[in-house]
Amino acid sequence: MGIPLPKPVMTQLQERYGNAIFRCGSNCVNGYRETMEDAHLTYLTDSWGFFGVFDGHVNDQCSQYLERAWRSAIEKESIPMTDERMKELALRIDQEWMDSGREGGSTGTFFVALKEGNKVHLQVGNVGDSRVVACIDGVCVPLTEDHKPNNEGERQRIENCAGRVENNRVDGSLAVSRAFGDREYKLGSGSQLEQKVIALADVQHKDFTFDSNDFVLLCCDGVFEGNFPNEEVVAYVKQQLETCNDLAEVAGRVCEEAIERGSRDNISCMIVQFKDGSDYAAEPHTTVVPGPFSAPRNSGFRKAYESMADKGNTTVGALLERRYDTLKAAEALTPEETEELSQFENGPEAKLTGAERQKWFSNYFQKLCEAASNGPSDQMERLQSLQQQAGIPLSILLSLMGEQTQ
């Protein structure tokens, strides 16, 4: 994972999809990571839908591949499909990634939802430690189980394949026992299911009542990484839905709450309701909400901030302009927001409008990038952030890191 950024990148990528039987909102934030490696998929038809969240590691290549591969696969499938067919698809998609020779890996959790009368039937697949968690009649109902190396059956397979479980990780490194990709754990002489790490999906089923207050969450493990267990996530969403009907906005609040509770990972949250979502069908699918530009002199933070703009199909100049205007229009600012606004100095001249005004913000960002290198300063900021998380004096942390490099 590396040393975390000194401040989280909280730019939100909101997505809204809907039709006559589904209403779906999702959100993701980069958080403290150097790169955003999550991906997700919503595919709707008049009678069924497919929903998935993919949490990449090493890079974002495998998670992005899974989004495309599952879309391509599901477009050709007859629904309903058997459990064996869902497992076959997962294994085939994994093998195609392996055959490509590319590096990286990803977890994947997904479900097919099929409307039958006044019921919606879910067929849930899971590979890894992302989760599907439902709220049924107000009660939290987990629909997946994390695939962790210390689970007895997983440990036995890993050890049978000449692997080891150390610190609850495969060979002391990988935190999940099932994943797509991760070729270094799939080089044994056995079959696709006789490897340290496999992409065999567990499949479960659950029925929901159409047009009820039930909902389903698909979340990467970053949501739960801090002190935010399933039951509290569901309770939090229920509470937010009492005053906010925008699922993408509520999903964003889940991401923010996860950061507040200690998560240092990328965070993705999708909320699905089984009711008329025609209002979402008419809206732009993607909205980018700029987060605080709170560490402008840190190169890692700037890179991650710009990357989130790219993923939202916008520019960092446009993002900073919107953030600046939001701060200027606020009736009151927190001390942190006041400091953030001051970093723009006097801002653009009043006479600048349109593309010229946006260019001012692009130039401001470029000047920060071209400033004299402050690499040591970057590193110290991030070390201080790591020290705060570890809860030990910085001098001891530096000493321990020095011992590990000897």
Swiss-Prot record:
Coiled coil: none annotated. Mn(2+) 2 binds at residues 55, 221, 265. It catalyses: O-phospho-L-seryl-[protein] + H2O = L-seryl-[protein] + phosphate; O-phospho-L-threonyl-[protein] + H2O = L-threonyl-[protein] + phosphate. Residues 23-274 form the PPM-type phosphatase domain. GO terms for molecular function: metal ion binding; protein serine/threonine phosphatase activity. Its cofactor is Mg(2+); Mn(2+). Belongs to the PP2C family. This is Protein phosphatase 2C.
